[in-house]
Protein backbone atom coordinates (compact mmCIF):
# COMPACT_ATOMS: atom_id res chain seq x y z
CA UNK A 1 0.00 0.00 0.00
CA UNK A 2 2.85 2.32 0.90
CA UNK A 3 4.72 1.41 -2.29
CA UNK A 4 1.60 2.16 -4.29
CA UNK A 5 1.30 5.54 -2.60
CA UNK A 6 4.96 6.36 -3.39
CA UNK A 7 4.34 5.46 -7.01
CA UNK A 8 1.48 7.97 -7.26
CA UNK A 9 3.66 10.68 -5.67
CA UNK A 10 6.44 10.04 -8.17
CA UNK A 11 3.92 10.06 -11.05
CA UNK A 12 2.47 13.37 -9.84
CA UNK A 13 5.94 14.94 -9.64
CA UNK A 14 6.66 13.82 -13.21
CA UNK A 15 3.43 15.41 -14.42
CA UNK A 16 4.28 18.67 -12.61
CA UNK A 17 7.77 18.65 -14.12
CA UNK A 18 6.35 18.09 -17.61
CA UNK A 19 3.80 20.89 -17.13
CA UNK A 20 6.48 23.27 -15.86
CA UNK A 21 8.70 22.33 -18.78
CA UNK A 22 5.85 22.97 -21.18
CA UNK A 23 5.08 26.33 -19.53
CA UNK A 24 8.77 27.14 -19.61
CA UNK A 25 8.96 26.32 -23.31
CA UNK A 26 5.93 28.55 -23.95
CA UNK A 27 7.98 31.46 -22.60
CA UNK A 28 10.40 31.06 -25.50
CA UNK A 29 10.20 31.34 -29.22
CA UNK A 30 12.02 29.24 -31.77
CA UNK A 31 13.67 31.09 -34.61
CA UNK A 32 15.14 30.17 -37.98
CA UNK A 33 18.73 30.97 -38.84
CA UNK A 34 19.32 32.99 -42.04
CA UNK A 35 22.97 32.66 -43.00
CA UNK A 36 22.80 35.67 -45.36
CA UNK A 37 21.69 38.09 -42.66
CA UNK A 38 24.16 40.46 -41.04
CA UNK A 39 24.27 43.08 -38.31
CA UNK A 40 24.56 46.65 -39.63
CA UNK A 41 23.93 50.15 -38.35
CA UNK A 42 20.60 51.91 -38.88
CA UNK A 43 20.37 53.82 -42.17
CA UNK A 44 19.40 56.95 -40.25
CA UNK A 45 15.85 57.67 -41.45
CA UNK A 46 13.98 60.14 -39.21
CA UNK A 47 11.15 57.67 -38.77
CA UNK A 48 12.91 55.54 -36.13
CA UNK A 49 15.77 57.84 -35.20
CA UNK A 50 16.26 57.79 -31.39
CA UNK A 51 13.53 55.16 -31.14
CA UNK A 52 15.64 52.02 -31.56
CA UNK A 53 17.06 50.08 -28.64
CA UNK A 54 20.31 49.54 -30.56
CA UNK A 55 20.66 51.67 -33.68
CA UNK A 56 24.29 50.54 -34.12
CA UNK A 57 23.33 46.92 -34.76
CA UNK A 58 20.17 46.17 -36.76
CA UNK A 59 19.27 42.74 -38.12
CA UNK A 60 19.60 43.32 -41.86
CA UNK A 61 19.28 41.34 -45.06
CA UNK A 62 21.99 42.42 -47.50
CA UNK A 63 21.37 42.87 -51.20
CA UNK A 64 23.58 42.89 -54.23
CA UNK A 65 25.21 46.26 -53.69
CA UNK A 66 28.16 46.80 -56.02
CA UNK A 67 31.66 47.85 -55.07
CA UNK A 68 31.72 45.82 -51.89
CA UNK A 69 29.08 48.04 -50.33
CA UNK A 70 26.22 46.72 -48.25
CA UNK A 71 22.77 47.26 -49.69
CA UNK A 72 20.49 47.37 -46.63
CA UNK A 73 17.44 46.12 -48.47
CA UNK A 74 15.51 44.85 -45.47
CA UNK A 75 15.72 48.23 -43.75
CA UNK A 76 14.80 50.10 -46.93
CA UNK A 77 11.82 47.84 -47.65
CA UNK A 78 10.68 47.92 -44.01
CA UNK A 79 10.51 51.71 -43.66
CA UNK A 80 7.47 52.21 -45.98
CA UNK A 81 5.58 49.60 -43.95
CA UNK A 82 6.57 51.36 -40.74
CA UNK A 83 5.50 54.68 -42.22
CA UNK A 84 2.05 53.28 -43.00
CA UNK A 85 1.85 52.19 -39.36
CA UNK A 86 2.86 55.64 -38.13
CA UNK A 87 0.28 57.21 -40.44
CA UNK A 88 -2.42 54.96 -39.00
CA UNK A 89 -1.37 55.98 -35.48
CA UNK A 90 -1.50 59.65 -36.51
CA UNK A 91 -5.20 59.32 -37.32
CA UNK A 92 -5.82 57.24 -34.17
CA UNK A 93 -4.98 60.06 -31.76
CA UNK A 94 -8.57 60.46 -30.68
CA UNK A 95 -8.94 56.72 -30.07
CA UNK A 96 -5.59 55.36 -28.86
CA UNK A 97 -3.29 56.28 -25.97
CA UNK A 98 0.41 55.78 -25.28
CA UNK A 99 1.10 56.37 -28.97
CA UNK A 100 4.69 57.45 -28.43
CA UNK A 101 5.54 54.12 -26.74
CA UNK A 102 3.75 52.24 -29.52
CA UNK A 103 6.03 53.91 -32.07
CA UNK A 104 9.08 52.78 -30.07
CA UNK A 105 7.69 49.24 -29.99
CA UNK A 106 6.93 49.26 -33.72
CA UNK A 107 10.49 50.37 -34.54
CA UNK A 108 12.04 47.62 -32.38
CA UNK A 109 9.67 45.04 -33.86
CA UNK A 110 10.30 45.95 -37.50
CA UNK A 111 14.01 46.77 -37.14
CA UNK A 112 15.10 44.18 -34.60
CA UNK A 113 18.35 44.63 -32.67
CA UNK A 114 21.00 42.18 -33.87
CA UNK A 115 23.31 39.81 -31.95
CA UNK A 116 26.32 38.29 -33.68
CA UNK A 117 27.81 35.05 -32.37
CA UNK A 118 31.53 34.86 -31.62
CA UNK A 119 33.97 32.12 -32.76
CA UNK A 120 33.83 30.77 -29.25
CA UNK A 121 30.16 29.98 -29.75
CA UNK A 122 30.19 29.02 -33.42
CA UNK A 123 33.76 28.14 -34.45
CA UNK A 124 34.47 29.35 -37.98
CA UNK A 125 31.14 31.15 -38.33
CA UNK A 126 29.70 34.58 -37.55
CA UNK A 127 25.98 34.06 -37.27
CA UNK A 128 23.66 37.11 -37.02
CA UNK A 129 20.49 36.60 -34.99
CA UNK A 130 17.54 39.00 -34.38
CA UNK A 131 16.56 40.03 -30.89
CA UNK A 132 12.77 39.95 -30.70
CA UNK A 133 10.54 42.31 -28.71
CA UNK A 134 9.27 40.94 -25.39
CA UNK A 135 5.66 39.88 -25.08
CA UNK A 136 5.13 42.46 -22.32
CA UNK A 137 5.93 45.22 -24.83
CA UNK A 138 3.38 43.85 -27.28
CA UNK A 139 0.72 43.64 -24.57
CA UNK A 140 1.33 47.25 -23.52
CA UNK A 141 0.95 48.33 -27.15
CA UNK A 142 -2.43 46.59 -27.36
CA UNK A 143 -3.59 48.08 -24.07
CA UNK A 144 -2.82 51.55 -25.44
CA UNK A 145 -4.44 50.87 -28.81
CA UNK A 146 -6.75 47.82 -28.88
CA UNK A 147 -7.42 48.25 -32.61
CA UNK A 148 -3.84 47.07 -33.25
CA UNK A 149 -5.03 43.56 -32.34
CA UNK A 150 -6.25 43.29 -35.95
CA UNK A 151 -2.62 43.31 -37.13
CA UNK A 152 -0.62 42.15 -34.08
CA UNK A 153 -0.98 38.81 -32.27
CA UNK A 154 1.02 38.83 -29.04
CA UNK A 155 0.53 35.07 -28.61
CA UNK A 156 2.97 34.30 -31.44
CA UNK A 157 6.06 33.40 -29.40
CA UNK A 158 8.30 33.47 -32.47
CA UNK A 159 7.71 37.23 -32.75
CA UNK A 160 6.94 38.13 -29.13
CA UNK A 161 8.69 35.71 -26.73
CA UNK A 162 8.20 36.17 -23.03
CA UNK A 163 11.86 35.54 -22.20
CA UNK A 164 13.83 34.86 -25.37
CA UNK A 165 14.19 32.96 -28.63
CA UNK A 166 16.03 29.65 -29.24
CA UNK A 167 18.07 29.13 -32.41
CA UNK A 168 19.46 25.75 -33.42
CA UNK A 169 23.19 26.33 -34.03
CA UNK A 170 24.29 22.69 -33.99
CA UNK A 171 25.21 22.96 -37.65
CA UNK A 172 27.62 25.75 -36.83
CA UNK A 173 29.48 23.96 -34.05
CA UNK A 174 27.48 25.08 -31.03
CA UNK A 175 27.12 22.14 -28.64
CA UNK A 176 25.91 23.57 -25.36
CA UNK A 177 22.25 23.15 -24.38
CA UNK A 178 21.74 20.60 -27.13
CA UNK A 179 22.84 23.12 -29.74
CA UNK A 180 19.97 25.50 -28.89
CA UNK A 181 21.30 29.02 -28.50
CA UNK A 182 19.03 31.45 -26.63
CA UNK A 183 18.77 35.17 -27.50
CA UNK A 184 16.97 37.20 -24.80
CA UNK A 185 14.04 39.40 -25.84
CA UNK A 186 14.40 43.18 -25.85
CA UNK A 187 12.42 45.25 -23.37
CA UNK A 188 11.54 48.43 -25.27
CA UNK A 189 10.31 50.12 -22.10
CA UNK A 190 13.90 50.63 -20.90
CA UNK A 191 14.92 52.48 -24.08
CA UNK A 192 11.62 54.36 -24.16
CA UNK A 193 11.97 55.80 -20.66
CA UNK A 194 15.59 56.79 -21.32
CA UNK A 195 15.15 58.47 -24.72
CA UNK A 196 11.87 60.13 -23.80
CA UNK A 197 13.72 62.10 -21.12
CA UNK A 198 17.26 62.43 -22.50
CA UNK A 199 16.50 62.94 -26.20
CA UNK A 200 13.08 64.56 -25.68
CA UNK A 201 11.59 62.18 -28.23
CA UNK A 202 7.86 62.74 -28.63
CA UNK A 203 5.10 61.28 -30.75
CA UNK A 204 5.93 61.54 -34.45
CA UNK A 205 3.01 62.33 -36.77
CA UNK A 206 3.12 61.12 -40.35
CA UNK A 207 0.64 62.03 -43.10
CA UNK A 208 -0.11 59.86 -46.14
CA UNK A 209 0.52 61.50 -49.52
CA UNK A 210 -0.88 63.86 -50.78
CA UNK A 211 -1.73 65.15 -47.28
CA UNK A 212 0.90 67.50 -45.86
CA UNK A 213 2.22 67.76 -42.31
CA UNK A 214 2.18 71.27 -40.84
CA UNK A 215 2.52 72.63 -37.31
CA UNK A 216 -0.89 74.01 -36.41
CA UNK A 217 0.55 75.83 -33.37
CA UNK A 218 2.90 77.84 -35.60
CA UNK A 219 1.25 81.15 -36.62
CA UNK A 220 2.77 80.76 -40.08
CA UNK A 221 0.63 77.66 -40.61
CA UNK A 222 -2.47 78.81 -38.76
CA UNK A 223 -5.85 77.71 -40.06
CA UNK A 224 -6.90 81.31 -40.72
CA UNK A 225 -4.07 81.55 -43.27
CA UNK A 226 -5.80 78.98 -45.47
CA UNK A 227 -4.81 75.56 -44.14
CA UNK A 228 -7.49 72.90 -43.68
CA UNK A 229 -6.42 70.64 -40.81
CA UNK A 230 -7.80 67.16 -40.29
CA UNK A 231 -8.19 67.31 -36.54
CA UNK A 232 -6.88 66.04 -34.20
CA UNK A 233 -3.86 65.65 -36.50
CA UNK A 234 -1.52 68.22 -38.02
CA UNK A 235 -2.22 66.87 -41.49
CA UNK A 236 -3.72 69.31 -43.98
CA UNK A 237 -5.81 68.57 -47.04
CA UNK A 238 -4.19 69.18 -50.43
CA UNK A 239 -5.21 72.18 -52.49
CA UNK A 240 -7.27 71.87 -54.57
CA UNK A 241 -9.20 69.21 -52.69
CA UNK A 242 -9.60 66.02 -54.77
CA UNK A 243 -13.39 65.84 -54.97
CA UNK A 244 -13.23 64.83 -58.62
CA UNK A 245 -10.81 63.28 -61.08
CA UNK A 246 -8.26 65.47 -62.82
CA UNK A 247 -10.09 64.97 -66.10
CA UNK A 248 -13.37 66.18 -64.57
CA UNK A 249 -11.75 69.25 -63.01
CA UNK A 250 -10.01 70.09 -66.27
CA UNK A 251 -13.37 69.98 -68.05
CA UNK A 252 -14.88 72.45 -65.54
CA UNK A 253 -11.88 74.79 -65.77
CA UNK A 254 -11.76 74.71 -69.58
CA UNK A 255 -15.51 75.34 -69.80
CA UNK A 256 -15.19 78.22 -67.35
CA UNK A 257 -12.27 79.78 -69.26
CA UNK A 258 -14.09 79.69 -72.59
CA UNK A 259 -17.52 80.81 -71.38
CA UNK A 260 -16.20 83.51 -69.03
CA UNK A 261 -14.18 85.08 -71.85
CA UNK A 262 -17.13 85.05 -74.26
CA UNK A 263 -19.64 86.22 -71.64
CA UNK A 264 -17.34 89.05 -70.54
CA UNK A 265 -17.15 90.48 -74.07
CA UNK A 266 -20.90 90.09 -74.65
CA UNK A 267 -21.71 91.64 -71.26
CA UNK A 268 -19.57 94.66 -72.09
CA UNK A 269 -21.47 94.93 -75.38
CA UNK A 270 -24.76 95.13 -73.45
CA UNK A 271 -23.30 97.66 -71.01
CA UNK A 272 -22.24 99.93 -73.88
CA UNK A 273 -25.51 99.42 -75.77
CA UNK A 274 -28.03 99.93 -72.96
CA UNK A 275 -25.91 102.08 -70.69
CA UNK A 276 -24.35 104.49 -73.20
CA UNK A 277 -25.75 104.31 -76.74
CA UNK A 278 -29.49 104.35 -75.97
CA UNK A 279 -30.12 107.96 -75.11
CA UNK A 280 -33.61 107.56 -73.70
CA UNK A 281 -33.01 105.95 -70.32
CA UNK A 282 -35.86 103.79 -69.04
CA UNK A 283 -36.21 101.61 -65.98
CA UNK A 284 -36.03 98.63 -68.24
CA UNK A 285 -32.81 99.69 -69.96
CA UNK A 286 -31.18 100.59 -66.64
CA UNK A 287 -32.01 97.11 -65.28
CA UNK A 288 -30.41 95.50 -68.34
CA UNK A 289 -27.32 97.71 -68.13
CA UNK A 290 -26.78 97.08 -64.41
CA UNK A 291 -27.33 93.34 -64.76
CA UNK A 292 -24.77 93.38 -67.57
CA UNK A 293 -22.35 95.31 -65.35
CA UNK A 294 -22.86 92.70 -62.63
CA UNK A 295 -22.16 89.81 -64.97
CA UNK A 296 -19.10 91.66 -66.35
CA UNK A 297 -17.66 91.84 -62.84
CA UNK A 298 -18.17 88.09 -62.36
CA UNK A 299 -16.34 87.25 -65.56
CA UNK A 300 -13.62 89.82 -64.90
CA UNK A 301 -12.73 88.00 -61.68
CA UNK A 302 -12.52 84.77 -63.70
CA UNK A 303 -10.29 86.35 -66.33
CA UNK A 304 -7.91 87.64 -63.65
CA UNK A 305 -7.79 84.20 -62.01
CA UNK A 306 -7.02 82.44 -65.27
CA UNK A 307 -4.55 85.13 -66.29
CA UNK A 308 -2.55 84.62 -63.10
CA UNK A 309 -3.07 80.86 -63.21
CA UNK A 310 -6.05 79.26 -61.50
CA UNK A 311 -4.05 76.94 -59.25
CA UNK A 312 -1.45 79.60 -58.42
CA UNK A 313 -4.22 82.06 -57.58
CA UNK A 314 -6.41 79.72 -55.51
CA UNK A 315 -3.59 77.53 -54.11
CA UNK A 316 -0.54 79.81 -53.72
CA UNK A 317 1.29 77.23 -51.57
CA UNK A 318 0.99 73.43 -51.23
CA UNK A 319 -1.90 72.65 -48.91
CA UNK A 320 -2.97 76.30 -48.53
CA UNK A 321 -5.93 78.02 -50.13
CA UNK A 322 -5.68 81.72 -50.92
CA UNK A 323 -7.01 84.08 -48.24
CA UNK A 324 -7.53 87.81 -48.11
CA UNK A 325 -5.32 87.99 -45.00
CA UNK A 326 -2.28 86.79 -46.94
CA UNK A 327 -3.13 87.16 -50.62
CA UNK A 328 -4.31 90.64 -51.63
CA UNK A 329 -5.24 89.50 -55.14
CA UNK A 330 -7.70 87.01 -53.64
CA UNK A 331 -9.35 89.86 -51.73
CA UNK A 332 -9.53 91.95 -54.91
CA UNK A 333 -11.06 89.24 -57.12
CA UNK A 334 -13.38 88.21 -54.27
CA UNK A 335 -14.66 91.78 -54.02
CA UNK A 336 -15.24 91.93 -57.77
CA UNK A 337 -17.09 88.62 -57.75
CA UNK A 338 -19.26 89.70 -54.79
CA UNK A 339 -20.24 92.95 -56.52
CA UNK A 340 -21.10 91.05 -59.69
CA UNK A 341 -23.17 88.24 -58.20
CA UNK A 342 -25.04 90.62 -55.86
CA UNK A 343 -25.91 93.04 -58.67
CA UNK A 344 -27.18 90.16 -60.82
CA UNK A 345 -29.49 88.94 -58.06
CA UNK A 346 -30.84 92.36 -57.06
CA UNK A 347 -31.42 93.66 -60.58
CA UNK A 348 -33.01 90.39 -61.62
CA UNK A 349 -35.51 90.96 -58.80
CA UNK A 350 -35.96 94.59 -59.84
CA UNK A 351 -36.62 93.68 -63.46
CA UNK A 352 -39.24 91.15 -62.36
CA UNK A 353 -41.00 93.80 -60.27
CA UNK A 354 -40.82 96.32 -63.13
CA UNK A 355 -42.31 93.78 -65.54
CA UNK A 356 -45.17 92.98 -63.18
CA UNK A 357 -45.91 96.64 -62.43
CA UNK A 358 -46.06 97.37 -66.16
CA UNK A 359 -48.36 94.46 -66.89
CA UNK A 360 -50.66 95.32 -63.94
CA UNK A 361 -50.29 99.08 -64.49
CA UNK A 362 -49.65 100.06 -60.89
CA UNK A 363 -47.24 102.80 -59.92
CA UNK A 364 -43.93 101.85 -58.33
CA UNK A 365 -42.00 104.02 -55.88
CA UNK A 366 -39.51 106.35 -57.48
CA UNK A 367 -37.03 104.21 -59.41
CA UNK A 368 -34.15 106.04 -57.78
CA UNK A 369 -35.03 104.20 -54.57
CA UNK A 370 -34.26 100.91 -56.33
CA UNK A 371 -30.95 102.34 -57.56
CA UNK A 372 -29.96 103.62 -54.13
CA UNK A 373 -31.15 100.49 -52.30
CA UNK A 374 -29.50 97.94 -54.58
CA UNK A 375 -26.20 99.78 -54.83
CA UNK A 376 -26.12 100.58 -51.10
CA UNK A 377 -26.71 96.95 -50.16
CA UNK A 378 -23.93 95.84 -52.51
CA UNK A 379 -21.44 98.38 -51.15
CA UNK A 380 -22.31 97.85 -47.46
CA UNK A 381 -22.01 94.06 -47.64
CA UNK A 382 -18.73 94.44 -49.52
CA UNK A 383 -17.35 96.70 -46.79
CA UNK A 384 -18.42 94.24 -44.07
CA UNK A 385 -16.76 91.29 -45.80
CA UNK A 386 -13.59 93.16 -46.73
CA UNK A 387 -13.12 94.62 -43.23
CA UNK A 388 -13.67 91.17 -41.65
CA UNK A 389 -11.20 89.65 -44.16
CA UNK A 390 -13.63 86.92 -45.14
CA UNK A 391 -12.66 86.52 -48.77
CA UNK A 392 -10.78 83.32 -49.48
CA UNK A 393 -10.50 80.55 -52.00
CA UNK A 394 -12.31 77.37 -51.12
CA UNK A 395 -11.42 73.75 -51.54
CA UNK A 396 -13.37 72.74 -54.61
CA UNK A 397 -14.34 76.29 -55.64
CA UNK A 398 -13.06 78.19 -58.67
CA UNK A 399 -13.05 81.68 -57.21
CA UNK A 400 -12.24 83.68 -54.10
CA UNK A 401 -15.36 84.65 -52.18
CA UNK A 402 -16.68 84.47 -48.62
CA UNK A 403 -16.49 80.93 -47.17
CA UNK A 404 -17.57 81.49 -43.57
CA UNK A 405 -20.94 79.77 -43.34
CA UNK A 406 -22.62 82.39 -41.17
CA UNK A 407 -21.39 85.30 -43.26
CA UNK A 408 -22.52 83.59 -46.47
CA UNK A 409 -25.99 82.93 -45.08
CA UNK A 410 -26.50 86.24 -43.25
CA UNK A 411 -24.98 88.60 -45.81
CA UNK A 412 -25.83 86.92 -49.08
CA UNK A 413 -28.31 84.06 -49.07
CA UNK A 414 -30.94 85.42 -46.66
CA UNK A 415 -31.30 88.90 -48.25
CA UNK A 416 -30.75 87.58 -51.75
CA UNK A 417 -33.12 84.71 -51.04
CA UNK A 418 -35.78 87.27 -50.16
CA UNK A 419 -34.94 89.13 -53.37
CA UNK A 420 -35.29 85.90 -55.34
CA UNK A 421 -38.64 85.22 -53.69
CA UNK A 422 -39.93 88.66 -54.68
CA UNK A 423 -38.65 88.13 -58.20
CA UNK A 424 -40.29 84.70 -58.44
CA UNK A 425 -43.62 86.03 -57.14
CA UNK A 426 -43.44 88.85 -59.69
CA UNK A 427 -42.70 86.35 -62.46
CA UNK A 428 -45.65 84.20 -61.40
CA UNK A 429 -47.84 87.29 -61.66
CA UNK A 430 -46.41 88.07 -65.11
CA UNK A 431 -47.05 84.49 -66.26
CA UNK A 432 -50.68 84.75 -65.20
CA UNK A 433 -51.17 88.13 -66.86
CA UNK A 434 -49.52 87.04 -70.12
CA UNK A 435 -51.78 84.00 -70.14
CA UNK A 436 -54.84 86.24 -69.84
CA UNK A 437 -53.54 88.62 -72.49
CA UNK A 438 -52.60 85.91 -74.97
CA UNK A 439 -56.19 84.60 -75.05
CA UNK A 440 -57.36 87.94 -76.47
CA UNK A 441 -54.63 88.37 -79.11
CA UNK A 442 -55.21 87.26 -82.69
CA UNK A 443 -52.57 85.23 -84.55
CA UNK A 444 -51.43 88.17 -86.69
CA UNK A 445 -50.98 90.30 -83.58
CA UNK A 446 -49.07 87.62 -81.65
CA UNK A 447 -45.80 89.55 -82.19
CA UNK A 448 -46.96 91.81 -79.39
CA UNK A 449 -46.90 88.91 -76.92
CA UNK A 450 -43.68 87.51 -78.41
CA UNK A 451 -41.99 90.88 -77.93
CA UNK A 452 -43.05 90.92 -74.30
CA UNK A 453 -41.80 87.34 -73.82
CA UNK A 454 -38.16 88.41 -74.32
CA UNK A 455 -37.68 90.17 -70.98
CA UNK A 456 -39.92 87.57 -69.40
CA UNK A 457 -37.71 84.72 -70.65
CA UNK A 458 -34.61 86.52 -69.38
CA UNK A 459 -35.96 87.09 -65.88
CA UNK A 460 -37.36 83.56 -65.68
CA UNK A 461 -34.05 82.04 -66.80
CA UNK A 462 -31.92 84.18 -64.51
CA UNK A 463 -34.25 83.65 -61.56
CA UNK A 464 -34.36 79.90 -62.18
CA UNK A 465 -30.56 79.82 -62.39
CA UNK A 466 -30.18 81.76 -59.16
CA UNK A 467 -32.70 79.50 -57.46
CA UNK A 468 -30.65 76.53 -58.65
CA UNK A 469 -27.52 78.10 -57.13
CA UNK A 470 -29.48 78.72 -53.93
CA UNK A 471 -30.67 75.10 -53.75
CA UNK A 472 -27.23 73.77 -54.70
CA UNK A 473 -25.53 75.72 -51.91
CA UNK A 474 -27.92 74.72 -49.14
CA UNK A 475 -28.10 71.13 -50.37
CA UNK A 476 -24.30 70.99 -50.14
CA UNK A 477 -24.43 72.54 -46.66
CA UNK A 478 -27.05 70.02 -45.51
CA UNK A 479 -24.71 67.20 -46.56
CA UNK A 480 -21.73 68.62 -44.67
CA UNK A 481 -21.60 65.69 -42.24
CA UNK A 482 -21.79 63.25 -45.15
CA UNK A 483 -18.89 64.99 -46.88
CA UNK A 484 -16.98 64.99 -43.59
CA UNK A 485 -17.50 61.25 -43.29
CA UNK A 486 -16.20 60.99 -46.84
CA UNK A 487 -12.89 62.50 -45.68
CA UNK A 488 -12.51 59.57 -43.27
CA UNK A 489 -12.99 57.14 -46.14
CA UNK A 490 -10.53 59.17 -48.18
CA UNK A 491 -7.88 58.84 -45.45
CA UNK A 492 -8.51 55.10 -45.15
CA UNK A 493 -8.01 54.82 -48.90
CA UNK A 494 -4.74 56.76 -48.67
CA UNK A 495 -3.51 54.40 -45.96
CA UNK A 496 -4.26 51.26 -47.93
CA UNK A 497 -3.94 52.20 -51.61
CA UNK A 498 -0.85 51.63 -53.72
CA UNK A 499 -1.85 54.41 -56.13
CA UNK A 500 -3.69 57.03 -54.03
CA UNK A 501 -3.69 59.84 -56.63
CA UNK A 502 -5.73 57.76 -59.08
CA UNK A 503 -7.85 55.80 -56.62
CA UNK A 504 -8.61 58.05 -53.65
CA UNK A 505 -11.05 60.99 -53.72
CA UNK A 506 -12.94 62.99 -51.15
CA UNK A 507 -16.72 63.18 -51.35
CA UNK A 508 -18.27 66.32 -52.78
CA UNK A 509 -21.44 67.37 -54.60
CA UNK A 510 -22.50 65.33 -57.59
CA UNK A 511 -20.20 66.26 -60.47
CA UNK A 512 -23.03 67.01 -62.91
CA UNK A 513 -24.63 69.36 -60.37
CA UNK A 514 -21.24 70.94 -59.69
CA UNK A 515 -20.60 71.44 -63.41
CA UNK A 516 -24.06 72.95 -63.93
CA UNK A 517 -23.49 75.31 -60.97
CA UNK A 518 -20.51 76.92 -62.71
CA UNK A 519 -22.03 76.64 -66.17
CA UNK A 520 -25.12 78.66 -65.24
CA UNK A 521 -23.12 81.48 -63.65
CA UNK A 522 -20.98 81.78 -66.76
CA UNK A 523 -23.94 81.49 -69.12
CA UNK A 524 -25.63 84.73 -67.95
CA UNK A 525 -23.58 86.96 -70.27
CA UNK A 526 -24.37 84.85 -73.33
CA UNK A 527 -28.03 84.71 -72.34
CA UNK A 528 -28.29 88.50 -71.89
CA UNK A 529 -26.72 89.08 -75.28
CA UNK A 530 -28.92 86.50 -77.01
CA UNK A 531 -32.08 88.16 -75.74
CA UNK A 532 -31.17 91.85 -75.73
CA UNK A 533 -27.86 92.33 -77.53
CA UNK A 534 -29.38 91.02 -80.77
CA UNK A 535 -32.70 92.87 -80.41
CA UNK A 536 -33.92 95.54 -82.80
CA UNK A 537 -33.45 98.18 -80.11
CA UNK A 538 -29.77 97.24 -79.76
CA UNK A 539 -29.26 97.18 -83.53
CA UNK A 540 -30.88 100.59 -83.92
CA UNK A 541 -28.75 101.96 -81.09
CA UNK A 542 -25.57 100.93 -82.85
CA UNK A 543 -26.88 102.01 -86.28
CA UNK A 544 -27.66 105.49 -84.96
CA UNK A 545 -24.54 105.71 -82.80
CA UNK A 546 -21.99 108.47 -83.34
CA UNK A 547 -19.35 106.13 -84.75
CA UNK A 548 -21.60 104.43 -87.28
CA UNK A 549 -23.19 107.76 -88.31
CA UNK A 550 -19.78 109.29 -88.87
CA UNK A 551 -18.66 106.33 -90.98
CA UNK A 552 -21.87 106.54 -93.04
CA UNK A 553 -21.38 110.26 -93.50
CA UNK A 554 -17.84 109.78 -94.81
CA UNK A 555 -18.99 107.06 -97.17
CA UNK A 556 -21.85 109.29 -98.44
CA UNK A 557 -19.54 112.28 -99.02
CA UNK A 558 -17.05 110.08 -100.85
CA UNK A 559 -19.80 108.67 -103.06
CA UNK A 560 -21.22 112.13 -103.94
CA UNK A 561 -17.79 113.55 -104.70
CA UNK A 562 -16.98 110.62 -106.93
CA UNK A 563 -20.24 111.05 -108.86
CA UNK A 564 -19.69 114.80 -109.34
CA UNK A 565 -16.16 114.39 -110.66
CA UNK A 566 -17.15 111.54 -112.93
CA UNK A 567 -20.25 112.90 -114.73
CA UNK A 568 -20.48 116.61 -114.05
CA UNK A 569 -24.19 116.37 -114.73
CA UNK A 570 -27.31 117.33 -112.86
CA UNK A 571 -27.19 116.35 -109.18
CA UNK A 572 -30.72 117.27 -108.35
CA UNK A 573 -31.73 113.66 -108.49
CA UNK A 574 -29.14 112.82 -105.90
CA UNK A 575 -30.24 115.71 -103.72
CA UNK A 576 -33.83 114.70 -104.08
CA UNK A 577 -32.99 111.14 -103.20
CA UNK A 578 -30.94 112.27 -100.26
CA UNK A 579 -33.77 114.48 -99.08
CA UNK A 580 -36.21 111.66 -99.46
CA UNK A 581 -33.93 109.33 -97.59
CA UNK A 582 -33.56 111.80 -94.76
CA UNK A 583 -37.28 112.22 -94.66
CA UNK A 584 -37.63 108.48 -94.40
CA UNK A 585 -35.26 108.40 -91.47
CA UNK A 586 -37.26 111.09 -89.73
CA UNK A 587 -40.46 109.23 -90.36
CA UNK A 588 -38.96 106.02 -89.04
CA UNK A 589 -37.72 107.79 -85.95
CA UNK A 590 -41.14 109.28 -85.37
CA UNK A 591 -42.71 105.89 -85.83
CA UNK A 592 -40.24 104.30 -83.44
CA UNK A 593 -40.86 107.01 -80.88
CA UNK A 594 -44.56 106.41 -81.14
CA UNK A 595 -44.16 102.65 -80.73
CA UNK A 596 -41.94 103.07 -77.64
CA UNK A 597 -44.30 104.89 -75.48
CA UNK A 598 -45.47 108.38 -76.43
CA UNK A 599 -48.91 107.02 -77.22
CA UNK A 600 -48.85 104.57 -74.33
CA UNK A 601 -48.36 107.10 -71.58
CA UNK A 602 -51.24 109.24 -72.78
CA UNK A 603 -53.83 106.54 -73.45
CA UNK A 604 -52.95 103.11 -72.11
CA UNK A 605 -52.67 104.04 -68.44
CA UNK A 606 -56.34 104.93 -68.33
CA UNK A 607 -57.44 101.56 -69.70
CA UNK A 608 -58.73 98.85 -67.36
CA UNK A 609 -56.66 95.66 -66.99
CA UNK A 610 -58.85 93.57 -69.23
CA UNK A 611 -58.50 95.99 -72.15
CA UNK A 612 -54.71 96.23 -72.32
CA UNK A 613 -54.82 94.29 -75.60
CA UNK A 614 -58.05 93.64 -77.41
CA UNK A 615 -58.85 91.51 -80.38
CA UNK A 616 -59.37 94.38 -82.82
CA UNK A 617 -58.73 94.34 -86.53
CA UNK A 618 -57.62 97.96 -86.42
CA UNK A 619 -53.80 97.79 -86.35
CA UNK A 620 -53.44 101.40 -85.21
CA UNK A 621 -55.62 100.68 -82.20
CA UNK A 622 -53.55 97.57 -81.40
CA UNK A 623 -50.34 99.59 -81.52
CA UNK A 624 -51.78 102.00 -78.98
CA UNK A 625 -52.47 99.10 -76.63
CA UNK A 626 -49.05 97.41 -76.85
CA UNK A 627 -47.10 96.87 -73.63
CA UNK A 628 -43.73 98.42 -74.39
CA UNK A 629 -41.52 98.33 -71.32
CA UNK A 630 -38.96 100.65 -72.91
CA UNK A 631 -41.36 103.53 -72.34
CA UNK A 632 -41.14 103.27 -68.55
CA UNK A 633 -39.30 106.49 -67.79
CA UNK A 634 -37.16 106.82 -64.69
Curated annotation (Swiss-Prot):
Family from the record: Belongs to the G-protein coupled receptor Fz/Smo family.
Cellular component annotations (GO), alphabetically ordered: membrane
SS bond list: none
TM helices/strands, residue ranges: 258-278, 288-308, 336-356, 369-389, 411-431, 455-475, 514-534
Residue ranges that the UniProt entry lists as topological domain Cytoplasmic: 279-287, 357-368, 432-454, 535-634
Extracellular side: 22-257, 309-335, 390-410, 476-513
Listed name of the protein: Frizzled and smoothened-like protein D
Domain of life: Eukaryota
